[in-house]
UniProtKB/Swiss-Prot annotation:
<comment type="subunit">
    <text>Monomer.</text>
</comment>
<dbReference type="InterPro" id="IPR006074">
    <property type="entry name" value="GTP1-OBG_CS"/>
</dbReference>
<dbReference type="Pfam" id="PF09269">
    <property type="entry name" value="DUF1967"/>
</dbReference>
<dbReference type="InterPro" id="IPR015349">
    <property type="entry name" value="OCT_dom"/>
</dbReference>
<dbReference type="InterPro" id="IPR045086">
    <property type="entry name" value="OBG_GTPase"/>
</dbReference>
<keyword id="KW-0547">Nucleotide-binding</keyword>
<feature type="binding site">
    <location>
        <begin position="315"/>
        <end position="317"/>
    </location>
    <ligand>
        <name>GTP</name>
    </ligand>
</feature>
<dbReference type="GO" id="GO:0005525">
    <property type="term" value="F:GTP binding"/>
</dbReference>
<dbReference type="InterPro" id="IPR014100">
    <property type="entry name" value="GTP-bd_Obg/CgtA"/>
</dbReference>
<keyword id="KW-0460">Magnesium</keyword>
<feature type="domain" description="Obg">
    <location>
        <begin position="1"/>
        <end position="156"/>
    </location>
</feature>
<dbReference type="InterPro" id="IPR027417">
    <property type="entry name" value="P-loop_NTPase"/>
</dbReference>
<keyword id="KW-0479">Metal-binding</keyword>
<dbReference type="GO" id="GO:0005737">
    <property type="term" value="C:cytoplasm"/>
</dbReference>
<feature type="binding site">
    <location>
        <begin position="278"/>
        <end position="281"/>
    </location>
    <ligand>
        <name>GTP</name>
    </ligand>
</feature>
<feature type="domain" description="OCT">
    <location>
        <begin position="342"/>
        <end position="419"/>
    </location>
</feature>
<keyword id="KW-0378">Hydrolase</keyword>
Length: 419
């Protein structure tokens, strides 16, 4: 399956159902009164973390997600049915961004609210009072939340394998896990992160094989800048370094890799790290190993020839790697964020655009919310709408801008002549 770790999508939660104007009409029931029911809630959109997924490919093919609308109210005070909520599976490690701000970090196998459905409108039964016993007032359902989102996947792995291209990372992953990455004797065989579950006794952990890093990866060279983000969630790092091949300098390789990790995220250097010194069967190995130990005496090193490793060597490597994940191992900070607090941003109540030909166009989130919520289908609803817009100062502002009787005013889809 194609690996996709970044997509842009639009989510539109369901609109709430409209409340209705209705009066009880039954034989032998005089003056039955208002009985218009409320609209149902619009369906919300949730993301659900799924450990079985490892790509955002489904979102690459589906750019828009729409929620189900709530049903309109009915006579006899019957509330319309709520719109069905939508639950969409996403890979664990998916981050959701709204206007470049992180609003949701999906790190657990549970549901996360992404877009909330609109509230259902009230029927005329709710507007009865001692002064108005037969109100012809109702409300439309509110629109569901509508967001343009960026999704970014950072794989959820306990240990990240890093190293220069063709150092043996894919070979190691194939030996210690059930993963079957592509292995070949040329650089950049691994083009996307590969995950494998490593079992050791009654325990297990997830290891990620990241594409080979080169000097300058943190600033965009090679493929490193694309995939370095995937190591940010790891709890430990294993360096796989070629100690035996000709023209290889393990000290230089190790310094360059650590430098790229530090430039990308300094916290990565705080993680437990070990080095797997690969290709111990080649002539240059002992010389390079001795120099490396003198330069980095405190670094833990595991000697191996991965291509011909025996099972007991593989078990030792697995034990050493598992040992990096002790209970006291400090994890990188992962903040779980939920979008339930996201609301529409009502910065300005309205914006007036005027033209020389006596035309005024009114826009703005608050005025849009008012015109959308109050249906202009009765005299009482029109009076209620008039009171709402007068309260926010729209009429006064139009007068200041020189509106004259007969001028045309447009508020989204609603037009009228000023009187």
């Amino acid at each position: 399956m194609r690996f996709v770790d970044y997509v842009s999508i639009e989510v539109v939660a369901g609109k709430g159902g409209d409340g209705i104007i209705s009066f009880r009409r039954e034989a032998h029931v005089d003056k039955g009164g208002p009985d218009g029911g409320d609209g149902g809630w619009g369906g919300s959109i949730y993301f659900v973390g799924d450990s079985g997924m490892n790509t955002l490919l489904p979102f690459y093919q589906t750019k828009k997600i729409f929620g189900y609308n709530g049903e309109n109210g009915r006579p006899k005070r019957q509330t319309g049915a709520n719109g069905k909520d939508i639950f969409i599976k996403v890979p664990l490690g998916t981050q959701v961004f709204l206007k470049k701000s992180l609003i949701c970090d999906i790190i657990l196998e549970k549901k996360y609210l992404i877009a909330k459905g609109g509230r259902g409108g009230l029927g005329n039964f709710h507007f009865r009072n001692s002064k108005n016993k037969a109100p012809r007032i109702s409300e439309n359902g509110e629109l569901g939340q509508n967001f343009y989102l960026d999704l970014q996947l950072k794989v959820m792995a306990d240990i990240g394998l890093v190293g220069k291209p063709n150092a043996g990372k894919s070979t190691l992953l194939s030996l210690i896990s059930n993963s079957k990455p592509k292995i070949a004797n040329y650089e950049f065989t691994t083009l996307v992160p590969q995950l494998g579950v490593v079992k050791i006794y009654e325990n297990s952990f997830v290891t990620a094989d990241l594409p080979g890093l080169i000097q300058g990866a943190s600033s965009g060279k090679g493929m490193g800048i694309i995939f370095l983000k995937h190591i940010e969630r790891c709890r430990a790092i294993v360096h796989v370094i070629d100690f035996g091949s000709d023209n290889k300098n393990p000290i230089k390789d190790f310094i360059e890799i650590k430098s790229e990790l530090e430039k990308f995220n300094k916290k990565l250097l705080d993680l437990n790290q070990i080095v797997i010194a690969n290709k111990c069967d080649l002539p240059n190995f002992q010389f390079n190993l001795a120099n490396f130990k003198r330069k980095f005496p405190k670094i833990k090193i595991i000697k191996s020839s991965l291509i011909s490793a025996k099972q007991n060597e593989i078990n030792i490597i697995k034990e050493k790697m598992f040992g990096l994940l002790g209970e006291n191992q400090k994890k990188l900070e992962i903040q779980e964020i939920n979008t339930s607090k996201i609301e529409f941003n009502l910065k300005a109540p309205f914006l007036i655009k005027s033209r020389n030909n006596g035309f005024f166009e009114i826009t703005g989130e608050l005025i849009q919310k008012i015109i959308q919520k109050i249906p202009l289908n009765s005299q009482e609803n029109i009076l209620r709408f008039n009171a709402k817009v007068k309260k926010i100062g729209l009429w006064d502002e139009l007068i200041k801008k020189g509106i004259k009787p007969g001028d045309l005013v447009r508020i989204y889809e609603f037009e009228f002549h000023w009187n």
